[in-house]
């Protein structure tokens, strides 16, 4: 992508809803709804927030683990013509997130003729639910899924379980929020040995050690388990006290810093709100119960192996109340200095950085990640 094309790609974020309505129509209808939650839940509204780009690149995979089978929604631009180039960008969403949150970056990577793959985590979006959500089991699923997708669509790799699906490929692993932990576990436990991971990109990573989710915090663990078994308790709070506030609910106010009447911004907020009310309380609590902190000493040790040349790039959001930029000090002090290439702080931006300031995120991602993946 030349300079003129890059400027055009990062200047304006666009989208095409499958409903065929304009963004102005969709936003106006939502703003005029007497009961926003009831309106957003209507089946006929679904296509207002289903984008053509996502639909054209959507594929479901049945992923088999030793103790569970899952139907996982993916979005990728791989095809029977093979994988574009040798680099595949793998995007891992965070807690209560789904693949749609990466849409601006997916379009950017696609426009640069690069391959991408992302997924709805189990229990979120359109992926099947689990009876429980151990974080390392989710990580295993992501690894198996990536292998399955590469085997299916790579013309250079036979569709054979005995063949290394990463042969000839470089992986850029991108995680958002909790997805940063999933990406780090994925790298340390499964992908370091493949020698395929070129870069890890951590978008608004959470606090490195969340004491409240420690397994020795027995009272908190029992409380979470109680809500997991009786999710309607959390539903009462979400439905009666939070989501009724619409775009003033916590899931919007904490995810967005930008304000104003820009129709694209309003559309993204309503899109986020629709995803928020679709998430089940049981799934959210299940992920908190299954939380596993990264062993940062072990992770750093894997990074510093002499035959590894990984790069780590961190994006923080200046106005993020969920993952404050102060949390990044741990990563800057802990991660090997030769691997930590850059820490980028996005001004006037909150937690859902791809929806809050998509143009700024794309501009920095193009310069710091995509362009450097060519080196």
UniProtKB/Swiss-Prot annotation:
Observed effect of gene inactivation: Leads to the appearance of giant lipid droplets and an excessive accumulation of non-polar lipids and phospholipids upon growth on medium containing oleic acid as a sole carbon source.
Short name of one Pfam family: Abhydrolase_1
Any one of the GO CC terms: lipid droplet
UniProt domain AB hydrolase-1: residue ranges: 88-358
Biological processes, Gene Ontology terms: acylglycerol catabolic process; lipid homeostasis
Residue window of motif Microbody targeting signal: 373-375
PROSITE patterns attached to this UniProt entry: LIPASE_SER (PS00120)
Coiled coil (UniProt feature): none
E.C. code: 3.1.1.3
First and last residue of the signal peptide: none
Primary location: other
The protein's name in its UniProt record: Lipid droplet hydrolase 1
Native source species: Saccharomyces cerevisiae (strain ATCC 204508 / S288c) (Baker's yeast)
